């Protein structure tokens, strides 16, 4: 009903308490002593929607507001990251949301879908560039997925979308044709962080092990 503008509220991101349990990924991190931080994800009106994020979110990072460019969000993240890096306190698990791949369609007075996606792509490139020049690059894994795969279904399969990996141990110039799911990404993050599976679904999922080298040391990335 929300999607069709017939009433209702957005059901995700902690908006409905009845749907929330205690097994979000952040809850598992907290239980196992893995530090974490969120930038925009599960944050509404400048406040986290889950108690587990209360002291683990960036207050200066803009949440869901499509009037704000993702390149602006990059600089918001950068300031916070630099402050944490300076005191050796960068959390092990971070979620960063650049939203403008979602676009606003052909809404009057708003940037075109091409402009929104270009802004989103540039912000992601700046993000990878900056991390790749940081002292923690060889210990970093970036997993990037689309919020929604826009502009219609994929030309091969409507269930298919893009996933990008970057990091010191990630193979360069490698295209993996293994049929992964979003749960595969979740399983990979669990293995990297030393977390147990949260459900039978991620326990049974294929991890992205084919995408990694046994040694790190890639040159820094530069966006263009």
Where are these regions (language model features)?
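N-terminal pro-sequences and low-complexity stem/linker regions of secreted or lumenal proteins
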Residues: 1-224
